[in-house]
Amino acid sequence: MTGGKSAGGKAGTTKNAQSRSSKAGLAFPVGRVHRLLRKGNYAQRVGAGAPVYLAAVLEYLAAEILELAGNAARDNKKTRIIPRHLQLAIRNDEELNKLLGHVTIAQGGVLPNIHQNLLPKKTAKTAGGKPASQEL
């Protein structure tokens, strides 16, 4: 009997390794999310589908925020997204603002807002361009 590895095993095991992220069509790492779920003591056991679903949700949220932040950067004629653009994107979107309402973004600033009572009053003019009469 010769030593070494036998040639037995399953037939046709020449498949290339494929990550769970690529199987799911995701850019976010499913394996890392699974490891963090296991080490985080959220539950005794973690199902196989849970990290895939969570990675997909995180990828969607990141894509949504980056899309809106990119639009904010383009509106400000910039090509690089800065924290200010993230702040504007999140605070101008109703659902993201609700989700991240208590989150502070460093160097994000605040939304420009002037209270209606502080704005100058509109003067009422007639169609002829003359000021409205004070007569009753």
Swiss-Prot record:
The [ST]-Q motif constitutes a recognition sequence for kinases from the PI3/PI4-kinase family. The lineage of its organism: Eukaryota, Fungi, Dikarya, Ascomycota, Pezizomycotina. The modification N5-methylglutamine is found at residue 107. Residues 1-11 have a biased composition (Gly residues). The modification N6-acetyllysine is found at residues 5, 10. Its main location: nucleus. One of its GO terms (cellular component) is nucleus. The nucleosome is a histone octamer containing two molecules each of H2A, H2B, H3 and H4 assembled in one H3-H4 heterotetramer and two H2A-H2B heterodimers. The octamer wraps approximately 147 bp of DNA. The record marks 121 as: Not ubiquitinated. It comes from Botryotinia fuckeliana (strain B05.10) (Noble rot fungus). The gene is hta1. GO terms for molecular function: DNA binding; protein heterodimerization activity; structural constituent of chromatin. SMART domains: H2A (SM00414). InterPro entries: Histone-fold (IPR009072), Histone_H2A (IPR002119), Histone_H2A/H2B/H3 (IPR007125), Histone_H2A_C (IPR032454), Histone_H2A_CS (IPR032458). Residues 1-23 are annotated as: Disordered. This is Histone H2A. Phosphorylated to form H2AS128ph (gamma-H2A) in response to DNA double-strand breaks (DSBs) generated by exogenous genotoxic agents and by stalled replication forks. Phosphorylation is dependent on the DNA damage checkpoint kinases MEC1/ATR and TEL1/ATM, spreads on either side of a detected DSB site and may mark the surrounding chromatin for recruitment of proteins required for DNA damage signaling and repair. Gamma-H2A is removed from the DNA prior to the strand invasion-primer extension step of the repair process and subsequently dephosphorylated.
